[in-house]
C-alpha cells in the first residue's frame, strides 16, 4: 500500500496535535517524545518473495526486522530478545537521532501496537547517547519510559507481550536479563488490539522535526542482535498463534522480512536484517544510514 507524502505528513501532524501532552517538551536535558507507531510502507515495494529465505520481503520507512503477518484475533503472545547496542551519535545534524528496539503485537497491518523495548537517543548537537526502557499501547497513549529499568549498552533484554482472553487485557513485560530487573504493565481501559501480527523490530520512531515524514534521524546503532542464539532467552523471537508457539521466521510467506528505507527515496537503505538463523528465531539488523 502506498501512502501519499501529503497524507503521511498530515497523519503524523494530527497524531502530534492530539496525543502529545502539552507539558512535554523536547530539549537536550529531557527524555525524547516519540511514537513507536505502526509500520509505514515505503513509496515502493518488492513484488516477489525472497526466494533465498523463503519469506515475504517488504520495504518500510520506519521498521527493520521480522514480523509474522497473521489473521485477526489469533495471536496470544509475542516473545523477543536482543542485546542493546552502543549508539554512535553524529553531531551537526539539525534534529535528534533515535533508534528503538522492541517486540510487539500488531502494527504491521493494523492501526494499534502493543509493545515494549529499549531506546537510544542522541539529542540534537550531542555526541553522547542516552538509553531508556519503555512500553506503549498505541494509539491510546504515547510511549512511556520506565526508570526502574536502567539500560546500558551490552545488556541483554527480553520482552513479552501477552493477551488474556478472559480479561481481554494485554500485558507487556520487559526484563533486563543482565541485571534481573523488570517491569510489567497492562493496557489502559478501553484499549483493544487486532492481534493479527507480531514483530521483533529495530525502528526509526516518529517525533522528529526536520523531515517531512515526521521521523527522527536513525541513530547509528551499528548491529543489533535479536533472538535466542544471542541472548539465550528461550523461545525468542517467537509468536503464539492459536495456542501454538512458532519461531517468528518459520511461517513461510506469513513471515515478513522488513528493510528500512527512506520513504521518499527508497534506494537509501537505513537498516536491514540479516537472514534468519537455522532455528528461524534469531537474526541481526545492521544500520546503514541516518536516512536523510
Residue ranges of model-derived segments:
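Secretory targeting signatures
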Residues: 1-27
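Exposed, interaction-prone regions of secreted/extracellular proteins
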Residues: 24-292
Amino acid at each position: 500500500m502506498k501512502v501519499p507524502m501529503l497524507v503521511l505528513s498530515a497523519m503524523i501532524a494530527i497524531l502530534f496535535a492530539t496525543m502529545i501532552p502539552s507539558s512535554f517538551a523536547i530539549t537536550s536535558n529531557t527524555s525524547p517524545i516519540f511514537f513507536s507507531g505502526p509500520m509505514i510502507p515505503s513509496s515502493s515495494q518488492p513484488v516477489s518473495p525472497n526466494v533465498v529465505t523463503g519469506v515475504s520481503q517488504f520495504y518500510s520507512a520506519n521498521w527493520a526486522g521480522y514480523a509474522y503477518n497473521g489473521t485477526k484475533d489469533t495471536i496470544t503472545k509475542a516473545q523477543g530478545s536482543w542485546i542493546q547496542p552502543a549508539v554512535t551519535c553524529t553531531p551537526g545534524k539539525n534534529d535528534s537521532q533515535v533508534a528503538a528496539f522492541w517486540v510487539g503485537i500488531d502494527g504491521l497491518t493494523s492501526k494499534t501496537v502493543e509493545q515494549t523495548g529499549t531506546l537510544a537517543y542522541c539529542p540534537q548537537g550531542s555526541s553522547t547517547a542516552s538509553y531508556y526502557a519503555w512500553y506503549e499501547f498505541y494509539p491510546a497513549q504515547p510511549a512511556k519510559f520506565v526508570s526502574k529499568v536502567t539500560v546500558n549498552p551490552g545488556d541483554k533484554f527480553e520482552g513479552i507481550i501477552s493477551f488474556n482472553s478472559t480479561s481481554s487485557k494485554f500485558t507487556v513485560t520487559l526484563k533486563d536479563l543482565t541485571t534481573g530487573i523488570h517491569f510489567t504493565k497492562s493496557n489502559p481501559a478501553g484499549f483493544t488490539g487486532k492481534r493479527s501480527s507480531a514483530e521483533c523490530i529495530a525502528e526509526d520512531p516518529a517525533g522528529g522535526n526536520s523531515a517531512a515524514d515526521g521521523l527522527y534521524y536513525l541513530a547509528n546503532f551499528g548491529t543489533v542482535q535479536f533472538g535466542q542464539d544471542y541472548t539465550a532467552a528461550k523461545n525468542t523471537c517467537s509468536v503464539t498463534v492459536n495456542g501454538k508457539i512458532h519461531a517468528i521466521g518459520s511461517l513461510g510467506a506469513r513471515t515478513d522480512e522488513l528493510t528500512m528505507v527512506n520513504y521518499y527515496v527508497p534506494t537509501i537503505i537505513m537498516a536491514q536484517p540479516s537472514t534468519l538463523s537455522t532455528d528461524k528465531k534469531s537474526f541481526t539488523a545492521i544500520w546503514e544510514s541516518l536516512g536523510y
